[in-house]
């Protein structure tokens, strides 16, 4: 159920009847203040201007033609030509009944698309660090949302599993295996990588072997491929532990690394040359783009093949876009990566389109995100200035949550307490990120994210358990509630009902824009409205049985919506706190 869509369609129909063209837009949005109604149509003035009409006169004409019988209690013209819409409480009550009976809480399945979502993307033989956190959890929240909306989602973990460094890594893995030390050494991937690099820099015999292995690997040598696969598998097994701890849905089956596209790159460069898009410049193959200018104001050159024959990330991203359209048959491809990659992605996809590798209908979308900062406003680091390992961050989250929960909860069993600590610790790290607009930088602050006040995971998780506790105090089951009729006699009930019915329009924005913070804001507002309703509208101690059952149904739908919403974010809920 999408109130915004229902109202938009009805008002657009009236606008067209009043003389507007097919492209008119009612611009219906939830009202910012109660005195402006529940929803407001803001598109009247722009359309009136096009028609050369007085906006208020046109608004009146539209108002006379709108068919919102049984949907709106009243409508009024405000200011220069806004239309304020006050929803009918009986219509709201009926739709709450329907939504409560629906497993998807009123969210209708969209026209199904195949959507590739490229996210996380760590490097092989390196441990995941905090720099991988945003892509991993924002991407996963959007994946969960798109699947909930009914789409066929293909997860693409675009891992860095190819490049000249693999000769060095294979040579060092071989050395370790000869010394029977692989299991011990590879437990610390960072140390493994550093040791390999040190040998490469200081041992010419080792370096020569490494260079030979690069060539052999690129030529498909069976031994080198086996050793390479071993490195990939060990890395991804370690990464999987992070994904599992983060409650992220990625598995090793979702790996689509750079190596997947490597065989396609020579053909792509040859084709770009044949089309006249790529030209030789100082031995390299370069595509000059008029749409981008260098500092001298000339078309910017984008290298697709170096003079030594090596390929670049741009070439790989062109191949990935082509593969996702032709092989995976996708309608959309979303890439979650740092804002600093924005120009790179724009250029790769512009070349992809100029070459005719994908049609205009294929949506290529860079869902960029800002940086995670420390309290000093600089990139988040360890106290010594090093990169924070993801596993260390999650360990600290659990430690801090343990301290917090131990101080607050004494009535939990050890099993219940462990579940709460994990849910709060990991949930706090995720929610602190997901609740921020992904395009902005944000400050990582333990004290704020672990607070039980404000837009935080602990507050949201507690709001859920608070509603669960209501049902733990009554013998009335969900089945017994089923025949009860919803009554919205109090304004607090009506406002809560409207917010509950806005779940679909919220989820659809997240799926379209890739913005989980919109869902976080919705859930926070919902929890606040429920709190206000709970304080002002007695439930279990209400003498009127019909009112009591109606309010229990509102509480039940709030509980289900909070749980479903948090699940879409990958945040666990608990029954007791």
Swiss-Prot record:
It comes from the Bacteria. It catalyses: tRNA(Arg) + L-arginine + ATP = L-arginyl-tRNA(Arg) + AMP + diphosphate. InterPro entries: aa-tRNA-synth_I_CS, Arg-tRNA-ligase, Arg-tRNA-synth_N, Arg-tRNA-synth_N_sf, ArgRS_core, DALR_anticod-bd, Rossmann-like_a/b/a_fold, tRNAsynth_Ia_anticodon-bd. Coiled coil: none annotated. It is found in: Cytoplasm. Its main location: cytoplasm. GO terms for cellular component: cytoplasm. GO terms for biological process: arginyl-tRNA aminoacylation. Keywords: Aminoacyl-tRNA synthetase, ATP-binding, Cytoplasm, Ligase, Nucleotide-binding, Protein biosynthesis. Its EC number is 6.1.1.19. CDD domains: Anticodon_Ia_Arg (cd07956), ArgRS_core (cd00671). One of its GO terms (molecular function) is ATP binding. A motif ('HIGH' region) lies at residues 122-132. Belongs to the class-I aminoacyl-tRNA synthetase family. PANTHER family: ARGININE--TRNA LIGASE, CYTOPLASMIC, ARGINYL-TRNA SYNTHETASE. Monomer. This is Arginine--tRNA ligase. It comes from Histophilus somni (strain 2336).
């Amino acid at each position: 159920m999408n109130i915004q869509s229902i109202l938009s369609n009805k008002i657009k129909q009236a606008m067209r009847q009043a003389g507007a063209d097919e492209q008119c837009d009612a611009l219906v949005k939830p009202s910012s203040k109660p005195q402006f109604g529940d929803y407001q149509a803001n598109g009247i003035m722009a359309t009136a201007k096009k028609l050369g009409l007085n906006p208020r006169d046109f608004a009146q004409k539209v108002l006379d033609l709108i068919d919102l019988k049984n949907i709106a209690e009243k409508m009024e013209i405000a200011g220069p030509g806004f239309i304020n819409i006050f929803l009918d409480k009986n219509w709201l009550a009926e739709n709450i009944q329907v939504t409560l009976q629906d497993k998807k809480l009123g969210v209708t399945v969209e026209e199904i698309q195949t959507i590739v979502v490229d996210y996380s993307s760590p490097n092989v033989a390196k441990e995941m660090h905090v720099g991988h956190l945003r892509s991993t959890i924002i991407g996963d929240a959007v994946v969960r949302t798109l699947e909930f909306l009914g789409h066929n989602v293909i997860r693409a973990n675009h891992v860095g599993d190819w490049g000249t460094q693999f000769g060095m890594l294979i040579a060092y893995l071989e050395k370790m295996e000869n010394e029977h030390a692989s299991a011990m050494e590879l437990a610390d991937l960072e140390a493994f990588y550093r040791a390999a690099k040190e040998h490469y820099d200081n041992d010419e015999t080792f370096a020569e072997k490494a260079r030979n292995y690069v060539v052999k690997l690129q030529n498909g040598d069976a031994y080198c491929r086996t050793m390479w696969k071993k490195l990939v598998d060990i890395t991804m097994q370690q990464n999987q532990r992070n994904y599992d701890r983060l409650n992220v849905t990625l598995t090793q089956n979702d790996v689509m690394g750079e190596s997947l596209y490597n065989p396609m790159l020579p053909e792509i460069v040859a084709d770009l040359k044949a089309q006249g898009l790529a030209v030789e410049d100082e031995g390299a193959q370069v595509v000059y783009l008029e749409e981008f200018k260098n500092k001298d104001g000339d078309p910017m050159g984008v290298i697709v093949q170096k003079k030594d024959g090596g390929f670049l990330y741009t070439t790989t991203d062109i191949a990935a876009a082509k593969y996702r359209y032709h092989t995976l048959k996708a309608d959309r491809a979303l890439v979650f990566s740092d804002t600093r990659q924005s120009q790179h992605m724009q250029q790769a996809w512009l070349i992809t389109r100029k070459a005719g590798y994908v049609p205009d209908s294929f949506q290529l979308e860079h869902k960029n995100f800002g940086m995670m900062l420390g309290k000093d406003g600089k990139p988040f680091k360890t106290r010594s200035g090093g990169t924070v390992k993801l596993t260390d961050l999650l360990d600290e989250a659990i430690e801090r949550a343990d301290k917090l929960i131990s101080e607050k909860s004494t009535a939990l069993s050890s099993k219940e307490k462990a579940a709460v600590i994990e849910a709060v610790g990991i949930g706090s790290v995720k929610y602190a990120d997901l609740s921020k607009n992904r395009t902005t930088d944000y400050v990582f602050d333990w004290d704020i994210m672990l607070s039980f006040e404000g837009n935080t995971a602990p507050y949201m998780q507690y709001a859920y358990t608070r509603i669960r506790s209501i049902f733990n105090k009554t013998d009335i089951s969900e089945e017994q509630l089923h025949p009860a009729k919803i009554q919205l006699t109090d304004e607090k009930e009506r406002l809560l009902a409207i917010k509950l019915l806005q779940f679909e329009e919220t989820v659809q924005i997240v799926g379209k824009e890739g913005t989980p913070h919109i869902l976080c804001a919705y859930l926070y507002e919902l929890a606040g409205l429920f709190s206000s309703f709970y304080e002002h509208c007695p439930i279990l101690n209400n003498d009127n049985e019909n009112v009591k059952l109606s309010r229990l149904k509102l509480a039940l739908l709030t509980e289900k919506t909070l749980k479903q919403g948090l699940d879409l974010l990958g945040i666990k809920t608990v029954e007791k706190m």
